[in-house]
């Protein structure tokens, strides 16, 4: 493949994972694209919980139908399948995305279903590493931080066609909490959700501006009611002074970010804070896991795309939990105050053979203090991880 063509193609694939989709049908205003990937992935780590085969396959489709000159219907579905388990072993596949919507020309689009929360609009800029990254505060099914369900999203590009580069989104998320005693409100459609993955009603918004020389600036905010179960757990934990589970009836997150993407150079940085929503340790907020009162998060990424297909990457990520719980032995109380929850340097490299085939290595250099009892007590790994993968995508 021509090197200049490859240099232009690779960044496009990174921005839009389905840009390489196979067109299945395109006739009479109806279009259907199929996309997917298979990642033969292996982790190497002294932590037994991370070391080993992590291979997976992913498949999805995007469809749209032209209703009239101004109105277009669309939908997307994406599914993930772990291929590192024995045949017949349960809980090895799940739906990542599933939503349907309408686009009203320059007036924007509206969709509902399982989709990305608007906070991720900014986080996506730094979530660009070969394997790791994007994990200081972004957690799946935790409010509107990452992929989540029950979200109604309105998006507008170029501000109704009046201001090129000015984009915004508005989002509403319905109640998702466990049914049964103590659920209190809503439909109880949360099933067997872990405590940290419950949520009350909430809203979010994001905005960004794309300059014509490759620079983008953005910000996002969300605020939600916490579930009755979360509030009750936090209240009870506060009464016994352990402080492992955040109190308060509202969960909030905000973030600001910037990226530069031009001349084969990619730079991105973001800062974010969360309150009463980010879980740490095991159990998704249950068992030996906890929910932080507050986190402060920072991520920065730098990459360069060579014409012959090589893309080196370096990043720094840190999340600091504030006013955390758990007994601090040498002081004899139940508060650790501030602790790093995530802290590492990432050095990676991807090589693209062509638009369908690539290989990568990603080295996560963990900077958490392995001698600090906080991490062992909360099930937080302090070991380095090296991920090596071979990817086929279409």
Curated annotation (Swiss-Prot):
Family in the record: Belongs to the Gram-negative porin family.
Keyword annotations: Cell outer membrane, Ion transport, Membrane, Porin, Signal, Transmembrane, Transmembrane beta strand, Transport
A cellular-component GO term for this protein: cell outer membrane
Localization in the cell: Cell outer membrane
Positions of region (Disordered): 222-242
UniProt KW rRNA-binding keyword: no
PANTHER family reported in the protein's UniProt record: OUTER MEMBRANE PORIN N-RELATED, PROTEIN YDDL-RELATED
An example Gene Ontology molecular-function term: porin activity
Name of the encoding gene: ompS1
Membrane-topology annotation of the record: Multi-pass membrane protein
Principal subcellular localisation of the protein: membrane
Keyword Membrane: yes
GO biological process, one term: monoatomic ion transmembrane transport
PROSITE patterns: GRAM_NEG_PORIN (PS00576)
CDD domains, alphabetized: gram_neg_porins (cd00342)
The protein's name: Outer membrane protein S1
First and last residue of the signal peptide: 1-21
Protein's job: Forms pores that allow passive diffusion of small molecules across the outer membrane.
Record's subunit section: Homotrimer.
